[in-house]
């Protein structure tokens, strides 16, 4: 791999990382702040967020399950008293 290709891959990874942060922050904000959101809609939002993240980082399912799923689980439990157990992996 030449230096130009290496730099391109680094920039792509940085772009995906920024998108990941934005997506997680946006999802977290909506889950906390949209008082019209139902539990099922929230679960769907988490499921769609997971799909989007795994499309950017296909080999990171375990990381999602360890780092982000508990975060979303906590939010859903705080808001609705139920977690993401209705999610299909």
Regions found by a protein language model. Name each.
Residues 1-89:
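Surface-exposed peri-terminal alpha-helical interaction modules
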């Amino acid at each position: 791999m030449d230096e130009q290709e290496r730099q391109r891959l680094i920039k792509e990874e940085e772009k995906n990382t920024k998108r990941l942060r934005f997506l997680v922050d946006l999802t977290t904000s909506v889950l906390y702040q949209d008082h019209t959101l139902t539990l099922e809609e929230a679960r769907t939002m988490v499921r769609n967020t997971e799909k989007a993240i795994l499309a950017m980082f296909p080999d990171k399912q375990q990381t999602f399950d360890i780092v982000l799923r508990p975060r979303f689980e906590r939010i859903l439990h705080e808001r609705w008293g139920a977690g993401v157990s209705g999610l299909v992996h």
